[in-house]
Amino acid sequence: MKVGIHPEYTAVKATCSCGNEFEFNSALGKDSIHLDVCDKCHPFYTGKQRIVDTGGRVDRFNKRFGAIGSKK
């Protein structure tokens, strides 16, 4: 690696909105950042995710507008 061209690599403290704090190394240039979601509060990782059923919307659309295309 060339000397003097790489950014400084420092420890960064991340604080989540749920209160979880952790440190990681980065060339970000800041000493702390605020996160909205982390692995401790994200629904995918906590097992509290909801599955959104969009089939009802398609059925409603077909009921409202499906007959328009079949008229001749």
UniProtKB/Swiss-Prot annotation:
Residues bound to Zn(2+): 16, 18, 38, 41
Position of the signal peptide: none
Cited InterPro entries: Ribosomal_bL28/bL31-like_sf (IPR034704), Ribosomal_bL31 (IPR002150), Ribosomal_bL31_A (IPR027491), Ribosomal_bL31_sf (IPR042105)
Any one GO molecular-function label of the UniProt entry: metal ion binding
One of the record's GO cellular component terms: ribonucleoprotein complex
Gene Ontology BP terms: translation
One Pfam family cited in the UniProt record for this chain: Ribosomal_L31
Cofactor(s) this protein cannot do without: Zn(2+)
Cofactor: how and how many bound: Binds 1 zinc ion per subunit.
Keywords linked to the UniProt accession: Metal-binding, Ribonucleoprotein, Ribosomal protein, RNA-binding, rRNA-binding, Zinc
Assembly with partners or alone: Part of the 50S ribosomal subunit.
Record's function text: Binds the 23S rRNA.
Listed name of the protein: Large ribosomal subunit protein bL31
Organism: Aliivibrio fischeri (strain ATCC 700601 / ES114)
Gene: rpmE
